[in-house]
Amino acid sequence: MKVRWLLLKIVSKLPKKVGNIMLKKANSTEIEEIMSVIKDGKEFLKQQGINQWQHGSPGCSDVENDIKQETSYVYELDGEIVGTAMLNAYDADYEKYPTIWTKCNNYLVIHRLAVKKEYRSQGIGHKFMNDIILFAKENSVEYIRIDTHKDNVIIRKYLSKNNFKELDEIKLSIKNSLDDKERIAYELKIE
């Protein structure tokens, strides 16, 4: 647990600025903008017929909790929030599947990754992920872990393009009983 706490301290070293794009820790004044990006993501998933994020979660209380836990991050372009993600050094659901992941105590988990609809298909999502990967590398993180719905073909292709390795199906503990709980797990070795 000490390693995970240390990593959370390391994660707090953001912001990471590149030109007019910045990855930084979110604050409570940004909840409305973050929820707008998440709402865009929910609508996008609904249009694709994907039963993920459709029944309340992630909601405002999730983002508020992420901010309190210092795990909520935003991606800004010229001061405008164009993306959001929850970055953490631990995931209890992932720990239930020790045989699918590479054995390691120093990993970063990405959840609630979303890009504002006006910025999709413009390379922002790819740049966002590259900056998260660069940040992980600079902080000696060994692996990045993420999961997505099996029907989310766009994100699955996105993860493959970013060199994530598809592992296996996992089942998440989700608050609501209406969203599908099965996800495909992915992992990226930071080199």
Regions found by a protein language model. Give the residues of each.
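A short beta-loop-alpha structural element at the N-terminal edge
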Residues: 22-36
